[in-house]
Amino acid sequence: MTEIPAKQITDNDILKDVYKSQNKQFSIDAIDILDLEELKDVQRRKRTEFEGYLKRNRLDVKQWMRYAVFEIEQHDMRRARSIFERALRVHISYVPLWIRYIESELKLGYINHARNILERAITKLPRVDKLWYKYLIVEESLAHFDIVRNLFQKWCSLEPAAHVWDSFTDFEVRQERYEDVRNIYSKYVLIHPQFSTWRKWINFEVRYGSTKTVRSVYSLALDALIAYSESRNELVDDCINLIVEFSKWEALQKEYIRSKSLLEIAIQKWPKSNTLNNALLQFEREHGTAETLENTIILNRKKHYEDILNEKVYDYDTWLLYLQLLENNYPKLVMEAFSNVLNAAIPTSRTKDKYWKQYILIWIKYLTFLELTINDIPLCGQKFEELIHNIIPNDDFTFSKIWILYAEFEIRQDNLEKARSILGRSLGLCPKRKTFKYYIDLETKLREFDRVRILYENFLKFDPLNLDTWRAYVEFEDSLGDEVRVRSVCMIPIQNNIGLFSKSFQLHLLEILIDYEMEYQNFDNIEPLLKKQVELSNFTVEAWTDYAMKKLTVPTEEQVQNFQIMKEERLKDSSALDEQEIEFEFEITDNNKDNARDVFERALNYFKEIKRDEDRARILQSYVDFEGQYGDISSRQRIEKRLPSIVNGIKDIDGLKTQNITYTFPDDENKSNIDTSNILALAHKWKESQEAKSR
């Protein structure tokens, strides 16, 4: 038989047992009592049990309370009082014991006994609010209002918490003794001088007092809090909140001058207070004119910006907003503000980060202000020099925009040579693409083409791998109609004598040169360029295909001659016709197609020789596509017959099986068949000659 496993005891079971044993109470068995002697016997036994338990554990206050309740149930109040007194000697600070003692006396109607116990309780435990409130509730329920008042006065002499004073004032309000309430508040604010206390007094006066008393309390509160705030900074916010409320109250009384004056005087004392500034702004919105409202808003914004800048001197966004505000509303302060930011907020980093960019933006705003707003040209030029030589660390980085703005400034002053000198200095100290482009554009507009060529040459020395610069240089020479220089500029990277340029870079310029040669109608120069293009492309299928398609668009010598004859005839017929207006046009003939086919054949031979079967198959497919577009059905079918058959196999290399694709070209098989036929024919001819000799 299989044994039934015993139930496992978990930690939760152990904790439950401990909890039950701790909460197990001393129980009293229910006994049926038939006569007085049995009652006395039961009482004696129960008292013995209680006494025995308390001897063992005299600190169990709840058991003392059960003992006292038992005696009360036996209608023996004398014994119950004795037990309560014994318990108090053990735990005099246990408040529930006092409360149970007091409530027991009250339930049985022993008011004087309860009052005596309450007196003892508040004397022994004067800081326990519950005992005081119990005493007050008892006396007020008995309508002993004088005793209640005396108790409150006695309690308040101990300088208790704010809720005690609030209870005292609420009691006097219920008795409608408003002067006594004012006397209480006059002492209350001395003990708790914070704004919340004064607000309670003010609310009382608003409800039960007059305008005069409300204003008087506001004034007292303001004087007191300001005096306290001199030594206690935490009361400053209370003062400000009180002033705002005082101002609102005065506005409700339609005393607008008083209301605004309060805020303005307070702002003079605490100019950085957002609460006061917002309150003044709100006052102007509700009671001011459009002009005063706008002035207040602007003033608040100005103070707000100044507060931020005092803490964050490198907050350039705020500086820009602040300067814009001053320009529009306080023009006399603008120069001082510019001086402050430009001298105090110079970035400390030696890298061109966002702080430098924002700082330079402020300089640009300053220089624009000097030139256009106050028209101080000498000072503007002086500040440009200061910025360039003393502020910007040109050894580490520079700002092309500043050099360009300086040059434009001198151009506006008709100092062209100085502008050139400035741009030249910029390129000498710290050359930048933006500066080169601007200088080139300037000289181009001035039609100083020799200077432009020099600048382009220096630009390419500075940044020779910038394709856009080479393209721009070529376009510039093309705009002047100088074919030789266009070709020379393009050939520098293409020839790549110093090995600086990558093949992709050379291919880009080669494309540009081919397009220009086509435009100039120098068709004889295109063939070597196309071959060079294929070579630089590592003889890829795409390069050969592109070569063939471009070869298709290159006219033959006959087509060029026909075009020249046609052009001469048209020029004779129309004297007003310009030679450049006649575009070169020709139809694609079989000769053009044969030229393209020749390229495809060369590509096939090339891939066959180097045994690149996959590329050979791809160029054949391109050849088929070409014939499909430009050839006829027979030419297309002829090329399609040359397409290879593909056989997929598996090759074992060092134990690893990989897929192997084999291409079989019909061209190769035909050649093999031709070679075999020739050998057989020769053998047959040799045999016949031998037979003839033997005869």
UniProtKB/Swiss-Prot annotation:
Belongs to the crooked-neck family. HAT repeats lie at residues 41-73, 75-107, 109-141, 143-174, 176-207, 296-328, 333-365, 375-412, 414-445, 447-479, 521-553, 591-629. Involved in pre-mRNA splicing and cell cycle progression. Required for the spliceosome assembly and initiation of the DNA replication. Associated with the spliceosome. GO terms for cellular component: chromatin; precatalytic spliceosome; Prp19 complex; U2-type catalytic step 1 spliceosome; U2-type catalytic step 2 spliceosome; U2-type post-mRNA release spliceosomal complex; U2-type prespliceosome. This is Pre-mRNA-splicing factor CLF1. GO terms for biological process: cis assembly of pre-catalytic spliceosome; DNA replication initiation. GO terms for molecular function: chromatin binding; DNA replication origin binding. It is found in: Nucleus. The lineage of its organism: Eukaryota, Fungi, Dikarya, Ascomycota, Saccharomycotina. InterPro entries: HAT, HAT_Syf1-like_N, Syf1-like, TPR-like_helical_dom_sf. Pfam families: HAT_Syf1_CNRKL1_N. It comes from Candida glabrata (strain ATCC 2001 / BCRC 20586 / JCM 3761 / NBRC 0622 / NRRL Y-65 / CBS 138) (Yeast). Keywords: mRNA processing, mRNA splicing, Nucleus, Repeat, Spliceosome. PANTHER family: CROOKED NECK-LIKE PROTEIN 1, PRE-MRNA SPLICING FACTOR.
